Amino acid sequence: MKRMIRILMIAICCMLTCNMAANAGNDKPIAVNALPIKAQTLLSNHFNNQKVILATIETGVINKSYDVVLQNGTKLEFDKKGNLTEIDCKQGKVPVKLIPQAIRNYLKENYPAQAVKKIEMNKNEYEVELANGLDLTFNKH
């Protein structure tokens, strides 16, 4: 009986693993108006002069995210609620209003001549990449 339960558990684990692998990386193109309202608002407020080249939805086993590529090469990533989680500006810089005030103050004092090229917002921290290639990590609180 124990052997049968063990075999059943292994089979279930294998099926779940295969299902997760099959669902990973499911990027599907979507229309801009299919993005969450919060994401649409951010795009119109901060990137109104840039055309959206590609918007995709990525559905995973547990979560869902949206990726947007703009005409100038800027890439944005949003979570399922439309909160910005990453912005990567290939040309130009991250709009100042998208950088938290405390980080802006620190950068102005310590790196006044450097533009922010990329910022990632994780659960507990911000990861910022400057134009000179320097990566900085800040706590959210």
Segments and roles (model prediction):
Residues 1-27:
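Bacterial Sec-dependent N-terminal signal peptides
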